[in-house]
């Protein structure tokens, strides 16, 4: 490695901040502690990077995730050693599951103390090995710029993911008068970006034979910013589109070719189309169990083409006839530049449209506020243009089903790991990254109690998110499963008492409201148009279930709770 002599000596912490700034990083989410004191001392006088002080390391990680998920930019977090680093584990695992580009600096004890059970020592490199795309422990101060440059490249290319840099305290404090050249030389890491042209031609050849084609749009379409190409392909060949949870927004919910989200809580039309299709083209979707149901019966009469940046995902769950490794945007562009093939999907489109129209959304009730009505009204008030953040649970599925999404990266949620507590900090990160966009958070009373301490920073950093808590006095999704599959034994899923959430909001200096009247709900919710941090608690029906529902292990056509029009 080539050495570069510095004009003046610099500490490791100076090199961290300067390298990040040179790579275009302008925001860090973090929480200080002993092992990162040299870095925070450098942050004190450093210009060009804004530091957001969270209230818990898990919160910092989810804030960085919200920042990254809503923009596609790298999210950066800093935590101290030992408990600071272990508190960050959930956020790192969540980012790995959802392919979120994160760079996480963990403090570490001095090099001489590593492996000797020093105060606040934890083997974070070993702990995070299964839940990171890559991780480093820096052993020389001069190596910091090279390691960071490599780490950013790894986190943001190919299939994005989290990279951890473990930084011993003395490495960050020591001065050096030279650095190793900060270049990227990774011969063993060469992600395939350009799809194979012959495989693209095979897709079109098979498409020409299809009578019932379906496009599946996963989160990879958003990450590749390929929504325009996806829609163009669907419109060119009149192919109906089903999305995964993380694929929501890649095609507008109002588009006539959109059938809805597929899978466990997917729409009737989407699940039936995936069952009956004879040719499925999946783009940026990993075929997780929440989408496929029983994999043995999933699309069992279909040929399957699978486009994915990660070759490890192709054929992992579902047998694939036409594998295509490469960037989703480039693959779709190639499909659009090839000569047009001829097919007639008129009868198929007529059939799936009928399926779409024969199902009513939900039964309206007069005496209780229904969560679906809340989300629909927020959709109207925000004109379907807000960044929607959710926590995890029933409200997450209702938000996926009933908000009128229009754009990619519009839904920010914890998909693969299903992390309760994700919502509040992720909404903060999304708003900091998108100050000119409305950011609305839907959260349950369970998840809200896990990370609500992050509300403390809303006024400090002027983050006017709208927190809408759908309060059903329970862990709603757990309760739903207990009522459906455990003979109604709601073991430890109902809250016998709850704190006064209105007082909590007041304690944080946040404008707060509580609504429980279905007759005035439409008018009540108009308060969200004010540009201030806001907490809205809505008491909703305590018995509402998310429907339709495919029971675990069942096939997608075996949906429960489908309500047809008379």
Regions found by a protein language model. Name each.
Residues 2-341, 377, 381-384, 457, ...:
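N-terminal alpha/beta PP-like core and its mobile active-site loop of ThDP/TPP-dependent enzymes
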Residues 119-120, 314-317, 323-325, 329-333, ...:
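Thiamine diphosphate
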Residues 2-7, 142, 301-394, 503, ...:
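Phosphate/pyrophosphate-binding active-site segments
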Residues 13-17, 21-26, 39-43, 353-430, ...:
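Active-site diphosphate/adenylate-binding microenvironment
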Residues 224, 271, 326-329, 368, ...:
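Conserved structured core elements
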Residues 31-33, 52-62, 77-84, 139-140, ...:
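Active-site nucleophile and cofactor-binding loops and adjacent substrate-binding regions
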Residues 164, 306, 389, 442-443:
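Generic enzyme active-site microenvironment
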Residues 57, 116-117, 190-202, 262-266, ...:
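A general structural motif
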């Amino acid at each position: 490695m080539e050495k570069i002599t510095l004009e003046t000596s610099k500490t490791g912490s100076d090199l961290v901040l300067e390298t990040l700034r040179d790579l275009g990083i302008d925001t860090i989410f973090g929480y200080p502690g002993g092992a990162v004191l040299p870095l925070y001392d450098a942050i004190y006088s450093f210009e060009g990077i804004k530091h957001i002080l969270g209230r818990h390391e898990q919160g910092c990680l989810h804030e960085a995730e919200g920042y990254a998920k809503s923009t596609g930019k790298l999210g950066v977090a800093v935590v101290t050693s030992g408990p600071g680093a272990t508190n960050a584990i959930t956020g790192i695992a969540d980012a790995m599951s959802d392919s979120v580009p994160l760079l996480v600096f963990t403090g570490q004890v001095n090099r001489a103390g590593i492996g000797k059970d020093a105060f606040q020592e934890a083997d974070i490199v070993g702990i995070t090995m299964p839940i990171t795309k890559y991780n480093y422990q820096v052993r020389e101060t001069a190596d910091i710029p090279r390691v960071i440059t490599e780490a950013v490249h790894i986190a943001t290319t190919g299939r994005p993911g989290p990279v951890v840099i473990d930084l011993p305290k003395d490495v960050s404090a020591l001065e050096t008068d030279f650095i190793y050249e900060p270049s990227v030389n990774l011969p063993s890491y060469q992600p395939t970006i350009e799809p194979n042209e012959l495989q693209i031609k095979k897709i079109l050849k098979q498409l020409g034979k299809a009578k019932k084609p379906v496009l599946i749009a996963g989160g990879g379409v958003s990450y590749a910013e390929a929504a325009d190409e996806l829609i163009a392909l669907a419109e060119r060949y009149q192919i109906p589109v089903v999305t995964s949870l993380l694929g929501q927004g890649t095609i507008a919910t109002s588009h006539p070719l959109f059938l809805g989200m597929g899978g466990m809580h997917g729409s009737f039309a989407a699940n039936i189309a995936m069952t009956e299709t004879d040719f499925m083209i999946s783009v940026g979707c990993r075929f997780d169990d929440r989408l496929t149901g029983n994999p043995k019966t999933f699309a069992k009469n279909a040929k399957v083409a699978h486009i994915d940046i990660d070759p490890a995902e192709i054929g992992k769950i579902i047998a694939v006839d036409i594998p295509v490794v490469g960037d989703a945007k480039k693959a779709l562009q190639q499909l659009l530049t090839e000569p047009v093939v001829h097919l007639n999907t008129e009868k198929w489109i007529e059939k799936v449209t009928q399926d779409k129209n024969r199902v009513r959304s939900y039964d309206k009730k007069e005496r209780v506020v229904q969560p679906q009505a809340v989300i629909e009204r927020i959709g109207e008030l925000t004109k379907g243009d807000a960044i929607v953040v959710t926590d995890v649970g029933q409200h997450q599925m209702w938000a996926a089903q009933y908000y009128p999404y229009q754009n990619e990266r519009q839904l920010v949620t914890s998909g693969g790991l299903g992390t309760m507590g994700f919502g509040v900090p992720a909404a903060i990160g999304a708003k900091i990254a998108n100050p000119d966009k409305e950011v609305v958070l839907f959260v349950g009373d369970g998840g809200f109690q896990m990370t609500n301490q992050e509300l403390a920073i809303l006024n400090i950093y002027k983050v006017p998110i709208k927190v809408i808590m759908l309060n059903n006095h329970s862990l709603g999704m757990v309760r739903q499963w207990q009522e459906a599959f455990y003979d109604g034994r709601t073991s430890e899923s109902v809250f016998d008492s709850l704190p006064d959430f209105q007082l909590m909001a007041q304690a944080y200096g946040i404008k707060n409201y509580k609504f429980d009247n279905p007759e005035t709900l439409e008018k009540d919710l108009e308060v969200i148009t004010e540009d201030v941090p806001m907490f809205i608690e809505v008491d909703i029906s305590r018995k509402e279930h998310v429907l339709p529902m495919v029971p675990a292990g069942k096939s997608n056509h075996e949906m429960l709770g489908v309500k047809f029009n008379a």
